[in-house]
């Protein structure tokens, strides 16, 4: 086991050798950033004799709030093993080794969003599935989908035009009157004010202070994120963090927070109105944990739940930790 400092190049080389996408040192430094007040990252290696490492995994500590109290949760990630050594039990041995270290840190629970292959290995070494991630989709423009089912282009465009007019009318009639949406490229101190006021009892959620949001989104080396702020007579009462894909015409909401449950629909309707004026996105997509409190009311804003696509697992000495209400979004996956 080592830290991150001094092993950056070895980590980057091993990850790039075993993954289809090429990572950069700039991205890696961003990912392994040690935020104020949390322990430094831990890197676990598989080495055969004195040869270069053939496998690894890391624990990067992130601040979460558990039933209203701040906790440093170890997030497992960067699980990598050379292709010709897979299926030999080395991955399971590595997870068991990490598990023994976690057992020696009883104050630090652990969390992971695994691949399907890693999920089986983790389940066999003491990790418990705590929930699933469910995509919710608001279809703004069905043209692409209609082209696959309707043979005539003119007919697909005609049906899509009727659908889009109906959506525009519905959004206009249901739009809130005493609220507005502001789009910004940074997060200011009002985000901290909202975060301090947000009720954190009876749930588990990632720290969403101004400093954490700036690291995760504003300082991201590869993606450009924007924030949409819900403004009322009270000031900032909610926000969402989003990006618009250029390849798949999807607007992805990565994080979302509102002061009160009733503010959720107001913000999403205003945001859908904004996305419709952009012209390019064909859908809005938000991924939430299956027990996320917002998931139960997204349908009121035009979102349709799709089949769950992945799971998240936890490991903790605390009884019932895996059964709590996890307030997770796509933003909990650093990559």
What are the functions of these language-model segments?
Residues 43-45, 52-62, 75, 80, ...:
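Conserved beta-strand in the GNAT
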Residues 33-45, 130-132, 217-228:
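A short helix-loop-beta-strand connector motif used in the catalytic cores of GNAT acetyltransferases and
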Residues 70-83, 248-260:
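Conserved acetyl-CoA binding element of GNAT-fold acetyltransferases
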């Amino acid at each position: 086991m080592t830290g991150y400092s001094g092993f950056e190049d070895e980590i980057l080389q091993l990850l790039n050798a075993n993954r289809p996408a090429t990572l950069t040192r700039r991205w890696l430094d961003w990912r392994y950033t040690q935020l104020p007040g949390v322990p430094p990252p831990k890197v676990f290696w598989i080495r055969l004799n004195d040869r270069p490492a053939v496998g690894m995994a890391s624990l990067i500590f992130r601040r979460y709030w558990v039933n209203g109290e701040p906790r440093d949760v170890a997030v497992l990630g960067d699980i990598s093993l050379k292709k010709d050594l897979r299926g030999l039990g080395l991955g399971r041995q590595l997870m068991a080794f990490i598990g023994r270290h976690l057992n020696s840190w009883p104050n630090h629970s652990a969390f992971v969003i695994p691949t399907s292959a890693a999920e089986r290995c983790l389940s066999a070494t003491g990790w418990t599935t705590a929930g699933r991630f469910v995509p919710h989709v608001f279809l703004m423009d069905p043209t692409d989908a209609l082209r696959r089912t309707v043979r005539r282009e003119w007919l697909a465009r005609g049906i899509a035009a009727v659908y889009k007019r109906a959506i525009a009318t519905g959004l206009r009639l249901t739009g809130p009157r005493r609220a507005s949406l502001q789009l910004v490229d940074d997060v200011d101190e009002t985000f901290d004010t909202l975060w301090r006021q947000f009720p954190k009892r009876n749930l588990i959620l990632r720290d969403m202070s101004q400093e954490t949001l700036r690291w995760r989104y504003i300082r991201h080396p590869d993606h450009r994120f924007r924030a949409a702020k819900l403004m009322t007579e009270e000031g900032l009462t909610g926000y969402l963090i989003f990006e618009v894909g250029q390849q798949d015409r999807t607007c992805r909401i990565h994080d979302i927070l509102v002061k009160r449950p009733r503010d959720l629909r107001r913000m999403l309707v205003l945001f859908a109105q904004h996305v419709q004026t952009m012209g390019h996105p064909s859908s809005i997509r938000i991924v939430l944990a299956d027990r996320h409190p917002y998931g139960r009311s997204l349908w009121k804003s035009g979102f349709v739940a799709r089949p769950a696509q992945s799971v998240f697992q936890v490991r903790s000495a605390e009884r019932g930790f895996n059964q709590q209400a996890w307030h997770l979004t796509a933003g909990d996956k650093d990559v």
